[in-house]
Amino acid sequence: MALRALAAEHTKQTGSEVTFISGSPGQIQQKVDAGEKFDLLIMPTPALAALDTAGKLAAGTRIALVRVGIGIAIRDGAAKPDITTPDALRKTLLAQQKITYSDSKTGGLSVINAQKVLQNLGITDEIKSKLLPHSDGQGLIAKGEADLGLYNVSEIPRAKGVVLLGPVPAAVQAYITYDAGVPASSGSPSAAMDFLKFIASPAAAPSWLAAGLELAEP
């Protein structure tokens, strides 16, 4: 994971250890509301913005950190159709028999963004009969039971038998952006800001890219 690798590098440089606590946005918000103390929060923009508005973050510390877009997943070894332009992607999708993406119970924001890409392409109605939401859609692709899928780029390399064909074109892309900020209750705000600056720096970009994410635009 990019963040853990960056934390290890930061520890080598500074001696400052980083401990991770993972959870869904709702779980993290509950912990914060219950008074649990953190030194840095990284959450999808709407979730962290809500905490910021509620006064839970130190003023001026919230930044857009990284973002992830939708990519096309295909079976490893399958023919590679053209998705390099919106028109090419539109034709490729309409030519398929079954197209999968995460179901609403497991996919969260990636489901919404997969649907946004289809809306941006203007093919929501045309393609409806081809869509196959599934909790293990990438498994269906690997078995040949679906032709391709729309997933967060960061999720695709993890699946066995499935490869990333590429991200969808920028003109129809939909991103999930993750913000970061220092809680007002942090016991080590200076160390937290140092780490935040490190993971948001250009030097961190290759690590994020290797994990399918990119530094967010300012």
Question: Predicted regions: what is each one?
Answer:
Residues D39-I42:
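Periplasmic-binding protein-like
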Residues M1-G26, Q30-A34, T45-G55, I63-V68, ...:
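Exported/periplasmic ABC-transporter solute-binding proteins
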Residues A58:
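Active-site acidic carboxylates
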